[in-house]
Amino acid sequence: NDNIKALNFNFSIQENDYKLDKILFKFNKINFNSEFLNIKQENNKYSVKGNLSNKKNKINNDLILLIFKNNFQNINFANSTFISNSEFTFDLNKKFKIKNLKISSQLNFDDLILKYESYKIKNFIKNYNNLISFKKSEINFKYSDEKFLIDGSSEYYIDKNYKDLIQFKIEKSKNKTKFETFLNLKNLEIIVRDIAYKKIKDDEATLQINGFTNNKKIFFNQINYKESDNKIELNDLEINNNKILNIDKINLDFLNVYNFKNQIDLIKNNNNYSLNGKSFDSTQLINNISNSESDNNFFEIFENFNSTIKVNIDEVKLDKNNIVNNFN
């Protein structure tokens, strides 16, 4: 039942100007209040301005379905609570059609559980069990006909006993969506088998991702991973349908599980690439190729790769016992 219950307010009228204040009501078992609601008649329209807030309440699925037209079956709201404070303005024509809607909201959520199955995450994060818990989430939300903006921060838990932090910002206008994400990864054990890299749990690490989407393509301006003296950075990466359309730079500077220091840069110059560096352990790459049951090669991750790569690496490790110097 979506009816408004227990409606109370103060009301005053002047010429073409309606003012309501101290509005209290209950909707879907949640108590809301509004300090003011102003309705002003101007020519052939009504201009509406007001605010709306609620104190700490439990989230119910009926409210989520009503607002988002989606019951988000992969999110568990059973123990979730939220606090909100919003301001809004809009115009209402004689046919009661809303125009020029603007909303500014501050939302606080607690105890959201996301069910997300991903073999890719499992490949990188040890003991990932398809659940991510979010607590103490603070979200700012702005909406207008031209732009949608959401930014915030939250604690997140892959292991229910250990928290990490996430910060994010998403801005959408027309067909373009910008995104910024910053993740603290201290309490995760991370394994990247293709480059023989491992991060131990409790070691400080961060991941920063900036980019945008446009016409189904994903552009990563920067992907920056840091853990102590280890660094992995990608610049200007463009992806479509899980294929790489372009990448301008890759920088690898890390100690791998075999205690070998990888220090190389892949840099695009016009349509070709140069691969330069002090040292690179190719053991894992060679093993992956030799043990593969597929005829696919590395370059099939690219869409129409048609470039030459000039290589100049001081030291390349081929296997446990063999190292090539001045590889070019």
Predicted regions and their residues:
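Membrane-proximal interfacial segments on either side of biological membranes
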Residues: 1-328
